[in-house]
């Protein structure tokens, strides 16, 4: 985000929006209703497929392989960001909440490129590295829809960094 107090972490925001779009698209294709309107069993089934698709996403011959459903979810998510960073009245209130000016990125191509960048950061945060159960970002940011939780290494190094910081400040003082 830009300051964390005003706007979201864009990677986390994109990832969550794309996941919920995927769930709604799939629910409508298979059950004829939105994900929130499904029963618990149907929701559990779709969440398991969602996790498998996103955590199992990989690169083959230098190309990220994505399903048609994921491509549709990405496009819907991209349209939100193109709107948000433009001057679309539909996202004006959100821009105000995020302390963003209208037409933050006036150039449409720049907005499309930004959306592609946000997708890429979300992909690295959700796809597991080969031969591991951790994403390229060590399962950060946290995203419960796909069981993206910080690895033990994340927790250990976070605690260690705070200890080193306090020790360093104590040494200087």
Sequence positions of predicted segments:
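N-terminal membrane-entry
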Residues: 151-165
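Juxtamembrane interface at the cytosolic side of transmembrane helices
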Residues: 167-173
């Amino acid at each position: 985000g830009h300051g964390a107090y005003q706007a979201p972490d864009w990677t986390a925001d994109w990832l969550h929006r794309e996941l919920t779009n995927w769930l709604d698209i799939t629910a409508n294709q298979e059950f004829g209703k939105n994900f929130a309107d499904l029963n618990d069993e149907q929701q559990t089934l779709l969440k398991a497929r969602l996790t498998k698709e996103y955590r199992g996403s990989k690169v083959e011959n230098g190309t990220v392989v994505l399903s048609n459903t994921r491509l549709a979810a990405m496009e819907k998510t991209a349209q939100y960001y193109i709107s948000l960073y433009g001057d679309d009245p539909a996202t004006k209130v959100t821009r105000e909440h995020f302390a963003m000016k209208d037409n933050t990125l006036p150039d449409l191509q720049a907005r499309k490129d930004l959306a592609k960048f946000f997708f890429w950061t979300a992909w690295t945060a959700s796809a597991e590295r080969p031969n591991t159960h951790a994403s390229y970002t060590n399962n950060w940011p946290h995203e419960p829809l796909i069981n993206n939780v910080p690895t033990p290494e994340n927790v250990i190094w976070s605690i260690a960094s705070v200890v080193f910081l306090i020790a360093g400040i104590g040494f200087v003082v």
